[in-house]
Amino acid sequence: MVNPWVGPFEALTERVDADWAGVWALACTACQTLEVVQQTVLGAEDDWVLNLAGYFLVSAFLEVVDVHPEAAHSAETMNPRGLDFGDRDGALAAICLLLNGARRKLTQLAGHTELDLDDQLCALGMHRYLESAAVTIARMLNSRSASLN
């Protein structure tokens, strides 16, 4: 599986600060990427695994918006070149990279002692949903590659 986005997305995740804005940007990019896959890949909009991953992503956003309502208005994606993927599996692999990057930043963020309890709970809840989305997509990729062998 060739994925031209692995390098750029990995570099993006490393440059992001471990704060709410950074985590939010990574998650928004993953969410927009998933939407592009669902709109451009034949049959993807009816794929229950992708829909489940989308549900987990939306749930992660709701965790943040509940505590930080202003976040919904400041959502930014991190791909100025536009989203254009050669194949579905490459896009899904890129989404997993973004989600794993967001989870790493959340772990760092949750370790900050200056966060209040609401932010700590928000970080833990968002981490759980992002992990579920990443695992869901990774299982799909693994089962697809196993069926090709």
For each predicted feature, which ranges?
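Residue-level recognition of alpha-helical structural elements
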Residues: D19, D46-L50, A91, L115-M126
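Preference for long, well-ordered alpha-helical segments
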Residues: L98-N149
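Leu/Val/Ala/Ile-rich N-terminal alpha-helices, chiefly Sec-type signal peptides and the beginnings
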Residues: M1-W48
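Generic structural signal for well-ordered, non-transmembrane alpha-helical segments
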Residues: W24, C28-E35, Y55-V65, A93-N100, ...
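Alpha-helical segments in soluble extracytoplasmic regions
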Residues: Q39-T77
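Amphipathic protein-protein interaction modules
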Residues: D66-D116
